[in-house]
UniProtKB/Swiss-Prot annotation:
It comes from Nitrosospira multiformis (strain ATCC 25196 / NCIMB 11849 / C 71). Keywords: Amino-acid biosynthesis, Arginine biosynthesis, ATP-binding, Cytoplasm, Ligase, Nucleotide-binding. Belongs to the argininosuccinate synthase family. Type 1 subfamily. L-aspartate binds at T122, N126, D127. The lineage of its organism: Bacteria, Pseudomonadati, Pseudomonadota, Betaproteobacteria, Nitrosomonadales. This is Argininosuccinate synthase. The gene is argG. One of its GO terms (molecular function) is ATP binding.
Amino acid sequence: MNVAQIKKVVLAFSGGLDTSVILKWLQDTYRCEVVTFTADIGQGEEVEPARAKAKQLGVREIFIDDLREEFVRDFVFPMFRANTLYEGEYLLGTSIARPLIAKRQIEIARETGADAVSHGATGKGNDQVRFELGYYALQPDIRVIAPWREWDLTSREKLLKYAEQHGIPVEMKKKEGSPYSMDANLLHISYEGRILEDPAQEPEESMWRWSVSPEKAPDSPEYLDLEFRQGDIVALDGEELSPARLLARLNELGGKHGIGRLDLVENRYVGMKSRGCYETPGGTIMLRAHRAMESITLDREVAHLKDELMPRYAELIYNGYWWSPERRMMQTMIDASQAHVNGWVRVKLYKGNVIVVGRDSKTDSLFDPHIATFEDDQGAYNQMDAAGFIKLNALRMRIAANLRNRK
């Protein structure tokens, strides 16, 4: 990229060591104006210090946006309508946050007249792909600066040395480092690196931040009633809550009961296997409850088709294709399937488990007790009809068996 061509760049900025160094590096290397953007998506950290840090480094245009409601309403909830799991386990807490950050960066670039965007993702992981696919999908002619693919600052020590040489303020706690590389938002918190790079080693109990261990969870269960409207949870125990407030509350309740811990090895889009640990207490409750709600409101073939398509949908999100035409097409179908997913589900939280103990829909239940009963159904279901059903469905197998017997 021609350095002289860049006039203004929007940087996804946390205020931490990496993005603080990137900010200064952009100013010095590209001789361009830097606009900072800091998103509050429920990571649990104060975002205002990022404003002070940006001002110290000479930034004139600073954006700090509270995106928690938009994050849950427009990204998390649509994903959960599909019961989405990547490789059967991962609830995509990191993956689903990147499209929103990319979207807002592009919006700010348009508002400020910036001709480039930049991020702090390394050249080794998935996030670089997720961010940049989003940028190009939303603004095809945008320029992208990925410092980790350009500079020679390949270690924490080199970053700290650069910061010291260029007068970049770094808090002492940042210099000391942390045991794990962590990423958090309202849906989850993730842990990577250090001891976790050995997939044979169990993580220390002290690593987990959002949940107690199941062994230390309360000895008494807790019951929750969750109300669904068109596939989304709208109320908890009779109280209507906004999407972000509801997920935050479920995180608290789930964490209290040791729910939502995951330790897995996943296949990154860039080709390598990576071990990560995750805490997704609220999401784990949501997933279990949503499947229960669908169990009595979705037609069998619709439910099975959704289950067949879900791995592909999850893969699209994991790999960064949220803004792709195929994801949008699948979302339209998924959303249409949720029109009648209305009612309530009761779950029991107990020592790491989410146990569904009740579900009902006054308006959309396909469960007919008169037909399903083991008692006298008063003629609601004619059992003699099953003979013809079975015989026709066995026809192809009978033909094949007869052929084999003649050979």
